[in-house]
Amino acid sequence: MIEHAEKLTQTSATPPTLTTLSGDVIGALINLSGRRRFTSQRVVLYAVLASMGHDGAIATARETLGMLRDAHVTLVEGKGVFPGVFCEQLREAYFGTLQGDKAIRIFIRHAESTLDAISDNTHGAPGLLEELLRISTPLLSILNGLTLMYEEQSKRHAQAQRKELQTMMAEIKVVSKQARVAALSAQIVAARAGLEGKQFAAEASNMTSITGQMDELVHKALHGALAH
């Protein structure tokens, strides 16, 4: 039964800030969270099929359970480019009031016990399967909530990136204006220098043209950033 499932120690990590994560990584985190939701229900389905004697159901259930476990460990503990729990909202969901990490790990442990019992055809298998079915419903609600949290973090990340781009473009525009003023001043100085300053004046004119093009590009980029 669920009360006899092994309690696993919660895991925490020192997370990076949201803005240091790429959009691709956050998108992959959303996919992993969605995979947990799908695989949890698939495990239950194939456990039921296995209890009815369907060929290959046990193997499929165990393979799916492995996918669920791997996805959860990656999301909570981190792996490769994946940061683990990277913000306070997720930390609260996993280890705070919701106790998402505990619920998911208990489900995984109970599913393992259920599949072993079904495979060995023990007398306790029906009761374990019944309990697995019972805990799968509240677990689905938890997994849905966690996936929504990752989607919300994705929106916040996009907003932060947009703000950063706007700030950068504004700074470039300021520098471009300063360069254009300097180029115009150089043209004036060159004109006063007479014939000797003609070449310098030509270069200054080119610089003015380039900074003008920069202004136009920055304007287009900034307009595009504000439009999204």
Positions of predicted regions on the chain:
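Parallel, heptad-repeat alpha-helical coiled-coil signal-transduction segments
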Residues: A191-A227
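Heptad-repeat alpha-helical coiled-coil/4-helix-bundle sensor or tether segments in soluble regions
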Residues: L65-H123
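Amphipathic alpha-helical segments and their boundaries
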Residues: K7-R35
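N-terminal extracytoplasmic segments of bacterial inner-membrane proteins
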Residues: D24-D55, V181
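Secondary-structure edge/capping motif, primarily at the C-terminal ends of alpha-helices
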Residues: S40-H54, L75, K79-F82, H110-A125, ...
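A conserved signal-transducing helical linker
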Residues: T20-G23, G27, R156-A170, H228
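Juxtamembrane amphipathic/coiled-coil helical coupling segments that flank
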Residues: S12-P15, T19, I135-Q161
